[in-house]
């Protein structure tokens, strides 16, 4: 059996509660489906700072590099607001992304049928929505140099950020986009601002060339990023995979997430380069929601995003597509049954806590796996 090593990093706030529900699913995958997952655990974020004075220890970083995939909960909270900037809880996630060389961020936007009414858009606009935004994660304006504020000496200051992309950075993220599209509806929409940005001109040129060279079987269209934002709200179901840079991906993925009306229920994945020998990519999976310290420890957190992150892990790190499909179907089925945590509850549904929601999803998953 192939190695299936998972590192669990529950983190802070509601992270440990949500991760506890994922552990139940992994236990079933091993006991009943004999999939042989090996799990280790570590500390990240504020709890790691409390234990080690770092947002993630070197030892846990080594575990992450040795694992086939990392499942990450959430980090941060007011308890650590005054810690030094370089060891703030969020620095743990940034180090994971940097040391694991995770350059491709996958943000799905899925509308569960039972929650179509929760969107601010008309149900017919978002019913059946299933799009994937692929954001380049390690380049662009967030990392480009120079990045500084200059005192001009005349009472004025100048803020400088630099948008930089090299050909190889665009090629590798484009390859991921086309590969993902082949497993979906075979369409990529590349978004940039080539009309006003030289980096956008290069992005367009490189994606076009890469498509012609290696991925001509996939449909490709180009769209200016501002027009893309408008089209996401106008008719989002026209899209399959949206490929874009770090800045526009940051903006567009949050727009797409809110189309569903359930930002706190969505998973994400960050992938690195494929190993030349095994073809495996380093990968980290995490819910889009934060640590929600205001409800931590109360047993009311919604574990769906964390469980959906495990489904993404099964799909993209281990090729267990059927199992991922069933787990996602189990989530949808529980919502169809009217079971809700407090954050998505409405009159006429059944309000449950974290554990009850996790148990309901697991029961549905078991039934679908029988």
From Swiss-Prot:
Lineage top rank: taxon: Bacteria
EC number: 1.1.1.85
Cofactor: record remark: Binds 1 Mg(2+) or Mn(2+) ion per subunit.
Catalytically driven reaction(s): (2R,3S)-3-isopropylmalate + NAD(+) = 4-methyl-2-oxopentanoate + CO2 + NADH
Pathway: Amino-acid biosynthesis; L-leucine biosynthesis; L-leucine from 3-methyl-2-oxobutanoate: step 3/4
Binding site for substrate: 97, 107, 135, 226
Required cofactor names: Mg(2+); Mn(2+)
Principal localisation: cytoplasm
UniProt site (Important for catalysis): 142, 193
GO cellular component, as recorded: cytosol
Binding site for Mg(2+): 226, 250, 254
Subcellular location: Cytoplasm
Residues binding NAD(+), per UniProt: 77-90, 290-302
InterPro entries, sorted: IsoCit/isopropylmalate_DH_CS (IPR019818), IsoPropMal-DH-like_dom (IPR024084), Isopropylmalate_DH (IPR004429)
Keyword Flavoprotein: no
PANTHER family xrefs: 3-ISOPROPYLMALATE DEHYDROGENASE
Function: Catalyzes the oxidation of 3-carboxy-2-hydroxy-4-methylpentanoate (3-isopropylmalate) to 3-carboxy-4-methyl-2-oxopentanoate. The product decarboxylates to 4-methyl-2 oxopentanoate.
Quaternary context: Homodimer.
Family designation: Belongs to the isocitrate and isopropylmalate dehydrogenases family. LeuB type 1 subfamily.
NCBIfam families: leuB
Record's protein name: 3-isopropylmalate dehydrogenase
Organismal lineage: Bacteria, Pseudomonadati, Pseudomonadota, Alphaproteobacteria, Hyphomicrobiales
